[in-house]
Amino acid sequence: MNVDHERAVAPDNDHGREPGVTIARRRLLWLPVAFAGAALSQGAPAVAANSAFAPLSRDELGERWRALGVELDLLTDEHDESLAAHVVALIARTPLAALPTHGKARPAVGLAGGPSWQLLPCMAIEFQMAPGAEIRLHNHPPSVVVSLCAEGEVRARHFELHGDAPPCTQLDGQRFEVQETRSLLLRPGQTTSFTRRRDGMHGFVAGDAGARLIDFATFLSDDGETFSYVTLSDEPLDEERRIWEASWAGKK
């Protein structure tokens, strides 16, 4: 297509242009095609064993993830995004079949969840989710969590506090506001994350075929009390800004 276009706008001419100029330009246009043909004939390049894109084993994933968590434990939350990005990259390089599992079967109804890997301060928590099963919206103690869809499809939603709120241990029904920051569909190999600074509440609903979800959590506090499910109002207070009224529901 490019060559035909070149012929149309710059035909050979005998009106003072140096001989061969048009021909040279046409040949240059063929170069990318030639390179592409050579690449196809040779096949895709092999990924070197020490490449940043080489597959990782389960042990390599765990070793690198834990080292990052130990280092971040000494740093401030301004480094959380870097940790999340590193963990996402490590997970992307690890075949889904090599990821840790708690071995529980997917139930016909509801979900089967629990820790599948403990590498303190890191922990993988796996959820086998029946079709339509829900992990209710909840917050977390200070942590960075990357959630991976390993099988099926799952709808993820993230929220943040909008304004002041009582402590999540205060279960007196007091209302406060939260803002929905993200809503996305995850398929196998896709991730979503939150840090201490953003998107700190999340919830999930499995698709029609169910799902396998793995949370890769890096805990940055010994605090185990600041966990609570969150109850949302039936309708948002502000549809455009995705602001909802909410209350803490405790751990059950």
Regions found by a protein language model. Name each.
Residues 1-23:
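N-terminal secretory signal peptides
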Residues 125-139:
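Conserved short histidine dyad/triad with adjacent acidic residue
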Residues 135-138, 156-157, 194, 200-206:
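Short beta-strand His + acidic residue motifs that chelate non-heme Fe in jelly-roll/DSBH
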Residues 42-79, 236-237, 245-252:
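C-terminal segment of N-terminal export signals and the immediately downstream linker at the start
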Residues 201-252:
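Double-stranded beta-helix
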Residues 163-196:
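Short acidic-glycine-tyrosine-enriched beta hairpin
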Residues 23-41:
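N-terminal export leaders
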Residues 142-144, 148-157:
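Glycine- and acidic-residue-biased ligand/ion/polar-headgroup-sensing regions
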